[in-house]
Amino acid sequence: MERRQAKIHVFVLIGLILLNSINQISSLSVTVNDEECVQEYVLYEGDTVSGNFVVVDHDIFWGSDHPGLDFTVTSPAGNIVQTLKGTSGDKFEFKAPKSGMYKFCFHNPYSTPETVSFYIHVGHIPNEHDLAKDEHLDPVNVKIAELREALESVVAEQKYLKARDTRHRHTNESTRKRVIFYTVGEYIFLAAASGLQVLYIRKLFSKSVAYNRV
């Protein structure tokens, strides 16, 4: 019973350490003018590659006619593993068909730069084949790897939601400024129109007085 409790305490401690180390990993900030790519090396075939991205800061209004960004993942062999079209943010996950350098590219069809918060993780959990090959690899290490991947999934979701929240705040601020500019412009237009009306009325009265004198 005591040994079981000790194991639980060890796993809890390991979980806290892993969670702290994972939380220290920050998302990449990529500015996409035309096309920008990020490379990540996958050590083992069959590893799970996952991540997310969100367009955080943009200089133009994302209306219904905005095409969004294109996202493409290319394998070391040059094959397209995954692609997303016309999006302002999404999640992705796939099994690596082989080990090697993978390329993650963003394409911006507009000339206006877009800032993207990009997060990627390569997860590896040893399987029975790995245990058979490596006699020093025990089931405890496998459990630790599984725990790490579970925590990584939670942290990735937190980072995705945080990036979306940042984008919403930026959009709200941009909308607020746009409303203020529109309101100020409307007041200026109304003041100018009123001024022109006053001048026009005064001109009519001056013509009427001159006619009566004649």
Curated annotation (Swiss-Prot):
Cleaved signal peptide residues: 1-27
Pfam family, one: EMP24_GP25L
Gene Ontology cellular component terms for the protein in this record: endoplasmic reticulum; Golgi apparatus; Golgi cisterna membrane; plant-type vacuole
Coiled coil residues, start to end: 140-158
Regions of this protein lying in the Cytoplasmic compartment: 200-214
Motif (COPI vesicle coat-binding): 204-214
InterPro entries, alphabetized: Emp24-like, GOLD_dom, GOLD_dom_sf
Motif (Required for the export from the endoplasmic reticulum to the Golgi): 213-214
Any Gene Ontology biological process: vesicle-mediated transport
Glycosylated residues (UniProt): 172
Transmembrane stretches, start-end: 179-199
Entry comment, domain topic: The cytoplasmic C-terminal domain contains an Arg-Val motif, which is involved in the anterograde ER-to-Golgi transport of the protein.
Function: Involved in vesicular protein trafficking. Mainly functions in the early secretory pathway but also in post-Golgi membranes. Thought to act as cargo receptor at the lumenal side for incorporation of secretory cargo molecules into transport vesicles and to be involved in vesicle coat formation at the cytoplasmic side.
Family to which this protein belongs: Belongs to the EMP24/GP25L family.
Protein name: Transmembrane emp24 domain-containing protein p24beta3
Species of the source: Arabidopsis thaliana
